[in-house]
Amino acid sequence: MVATSRLNGLVGAMENGGIAFSAFVPMDINSAQAMAASRFDGIIYEGEHSPWDIVALGHCLQYMLDRRQIADSDSIAPRVTPLARIPVNGIEMGQWHAKQALDTGTYGIVWP
C-alpha cells in the first residue's frame, strides 16, 4: 500500500503526532497572500466577528494558490490549509454559512 499525504495539512500534522499551528486572519487579499507563504499549518478566515462575505472568501482562496509550489511538489495540497470561522448559528438558522464556505473551497469549518 502506498502512503499518501493528506490535502489538509492540519489533519496530517496531528495524525503524525505533531502539533498543528494556525492563525485567525481577516477575509482580505493581502492577508491571504501573506499567510499563504507563512510557516503556519493552517489559517482561519474570520467570518464570525466581521460581515460574512463569501465573495471575499473566494478571492482569498484564489490568492492563496501558489502554482509553483504545486508544480514543484507534485501535489495539489496547499502549503497552508484554509479554514473558515462562520457566524454563530442562532435563531437566524445560519447553517448555510458552513455549506457556502466548504463549497467555496475551505478545508474545514470552525464553529463559534
Locations of regions flagged by a protein language model:
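Expand to "…catalyze enediolate/carbanion chemistry for C-C bond making/breaking, isomerization
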Residues: 1-112
